[in-house]
Design a protein with these regions (language model features):
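P-loop NTPase catalytic nucleotide-binding module
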Residues: 1-69, 124
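Generic, well-ordered alpha-helical scaffold segments in large soluble proteins
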Residues: 2, 28-35, 65, 83, ...
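Conserved short loop/turn motifs at secondary-structure junctions
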Residues: 10-20, 191-204
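Conserved nucleotide-binding/hydrolysis modules and their immediate coupling elements
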Residues: 44-158
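Helix N-cap motif at beta-to-alpha junctions
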Residues: 130-131, 202-208
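Short, hydrophobic beta-strand segments
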Residues: 152-165, 192-200
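Gly/Ser-centered flexible loop/linker motifs
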Residues: 168-194
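Single conserved hydrophobic/aromatic residue that forms the stacking wall/gate
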Residues: 209-218
């Protein structure tokens, strides 16, 4: 009940690299976390409640984008309603563009498993989409759902950043904007008063861990 009412937020300490705490987390997800059908219905931008109904209209919400070597952009989504299949032609409700879902995957760590179908409540990934950004909604025929962009907590930590070589400023900004697409909790600011580029994030570790390295600037 606490999880359903969003009054309880369990915290787990895990390390994927050393496989510490992962089993406990997975057991909790499998045994305790409510089914999607038990959760409150989600409201779209018009305030209409959308039930996670597998027989409903097809609608996907994209909540994360990452760029991976040799693959390119990987777009992560949740099936908000209906079912999605390989080869489905969908419409981007935010950008007005058409998109074909060539392949769909379920993801476990660094592993991607190709599947033919995902249903309402499932989380999956698609690769090499043409015009999909974090926060976009893709809909099937005769569906006009559009979901609000996820509201993230305000940034807690700020750090100034500059390239080793001044000639690399444009390249650095390009990398920062790409990282912003991958992690919307990043806020990039060009401070006129300080004449510095500032990055704001959720914590010091987050900024240190994800800041561009000299290798990225090549």
């Amino acid at each position: 009940k606490g999880l359903i009412a969003r009054g309880m937020f369990p915290v787990f300490c895990v390390c994927g690299g050393k496989d510490m705490g992962v089993r406990r987390l997975m057991e909790f997800l499998g045994n305790v976390v409510p089914f999607v059908s038990e959760m409150p219905k989600v409201q779209n931008t018009e305030g209409k409640e959308v039930a996670p109904d597998t027989n409903g209209p097809e609608s996907l919400y994209f909540f994360k984008t990452s760029v991976e070597p040799h693959i390119g952009e990987v777009s992560y989504f949740k099936v908000m309603s209906g079912k999605v299949h390989e080869g489905d032609d969908l419409l981007n409700a935010d950008r007005g563009s058409k998109e074909r879902i060539a392949q769909i995957y379920v993801v476990a760590g660094g592993n991607r498993v190709k599947v033919e179908e995902l249903q309402a409540g499932d989380i999956g990934a698609a690769v090499k989409l043409k015009d999909v950004k974090t926060g976009n909604t893709l809909n099937g025929k005769d569906c006009d759902y559009k979901f609000n962009f996820i509201k993230y907590p305000n940034s807690k930590y700020t750090r100034a950043i500059k390239p080793v070589n001044e000639a690399d400023v444009e390249k650095m900004m390009s990398i920062l904007n790409r990282m912003r697409e991958e992690d919307p909790t990043w806020v990039i600011e060009q401070s006129k008063e300080l004449k510095q580029t500032l990055v704001h994030g959720q914590g010091e570790f987050c900024l240190l861990y994800t800041s561009p390295s000299p290798r990225d600037m090549r």
